[in-house]
């Protein structure tokens, strides 16, 4: 875990942006982009985006999509994912899961919610096409 934290700390060179979604008095969730790095050696131009997802108790992320595939690492709490055509899965602190654009994560076919009594934090690594 120490090497993971050290690696994350070294890769976090600047805050590239952030987003927050909330409706009325619903619990909030916020994703903060920690870094974006151009990647070579792939067909096309891609960036690796690292985002910290911070979810308040009871927060829900509506159906959505991502531009590219990515690995998720649950740092704290638990997140329940409703996958397309499958039952839900809950991932607790210390576990990982993978989301791939178009397969288990088509547009409007996946949602998430904080499954913990407290705050949930998920580190998201995404491989996105460069715009």
Locate each region found by the language model.
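Bacterial N-terminal signal peptides that target proteins for export
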Residues: 1-9
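Bacterial N-terminal signal peptides
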Residues: 9-18
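Sec/Tat signal peptide C-region and signal peptidase I cleavage site
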Residues: 18-26
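A short glycine-rich, His/Asp/Glu-containing loop-to-beta-strand
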Residues: 28-62, 120, 125
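Extracellular/periplasmic catalytic domains that process cell-envelope and extracellular macromolecules
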Residues: 45, 65, 73, 90, ...
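Short acidic-glycine-tyrosine-enriched beta hairpin
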Residues: 55-56, 85-104
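Glycine- and acidic-residue-biased ligand/ion/polar-headgroup-sensing regions
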Residues: 67-86, 95
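Ligand-binding loop in jelly-roll beta-barrel domains
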Residues: 88, 101-131
């Amino acid at each position: 875990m120490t090497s993971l934290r050290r690696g994350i700390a070294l890769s976090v060179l600047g805050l590239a942006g952030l987003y927050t979604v909330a409706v009325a008095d619903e619990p909030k969730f916020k994703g903060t982009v920690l870094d974006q790095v151009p990647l070579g050696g792939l067909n096309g131009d891609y960036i690796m985006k690292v985002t910290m997802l911070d979810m308040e108790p009871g927060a829900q992320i509506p159906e959505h999509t991502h531009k590219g595939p990515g690995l998720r690492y649950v740092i704290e709490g638990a997140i329940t994912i409703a996958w397309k055509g499958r039952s839900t899965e809950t991932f607790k602190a210390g576990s990982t899961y993978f989301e791939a654009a178009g397969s288990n994560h088509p547009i409007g076919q996946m949602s998430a919610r904080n499954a913990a009594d407290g705050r949930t934090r998920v580190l998201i690594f995404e491989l996105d096409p460069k715009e």
